[in-house]
Amino acid sequence: YVTALLVKTLRSAGYDVGYYKAAISGARTVEESDAGFVNRFAQIREPEDMLLSYLYQNAVSPHLAARIEGNPVEKDVIMSAWERVTAAYPYVTMEGSGGIMCPIRHDEKAVYYLEDIIRWLRLPVLVIADAGLGTINRVVTTCEYIRRRNISVKGIILNHWKGGVMEEDNVEMIEEITGVKVLARVKKGDTALDIDPETIISLYE
């Protein structure tokens, strides 16, 4: 949902932004998946075969879905897909699958986590997290892990924002501990991000 808001905000401002996700589980078709939702919501009209490389029906982690369905993620497929989508759009948002350590493939031939895909594609990261109780620890540990892998953290967006003293304090503590700015707060039903498009587009540089 946050990725859809991000892409829609930029496209509404006139930026030609595409979308890509390496693997999605828990959907029967691309149309039913997160990728299909982003494509519709942000009005990208991107061909389905450019949106997504691997679609798994089982609603489990991609590595397990791949094992069950016999279709493991291959690095060369991801690299080729990324080359194609970046050739079609000057800006591309890649949505992650789960958290930074989400297993994408884990078998006797190869072991990949989300962080591996990020490093293959040489991408910076925007951390998306729930705004509520427990988010300070989750965001701080995620940012610290990402930095230890020499991946740039461009900013943080807090989802399911309700407001109040606890969530405002979460923002202050996260920014103080990580040194990374909370760029936006997303409430249920929001149709755009509360951040100007120029700030968002600068994250792609």
State what each model feature region is.
Residues 78, 82-110:
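Switch II (G3) loop of P-loop NTPases
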Residues 1-72, 76, 81-84:
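N-terminal phosphate/diphosphate-binding loop that engages ATP/GTP or pyrophosphate donors
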Residues 16-17, 92, 125, 153-154:
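Hydrophobic anchor at the start of a short beta-strand
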Residues 143-205:
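C-terminal lobe/tail of nucleotide-utilizing enzymes
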Residues 4-11, 114-118, 137-147:
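Histidine-anchored nucleotide/phosphate-binding helix
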Residues 107-131:
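Inter-motif core of Ras-like GTPase G domains
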Residues 107-115, 140-141, 167-172:
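Charged helix-capping and loop-helix junction motifs
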Residues 21, 126-129, 154-160:
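Short internal beta-strands
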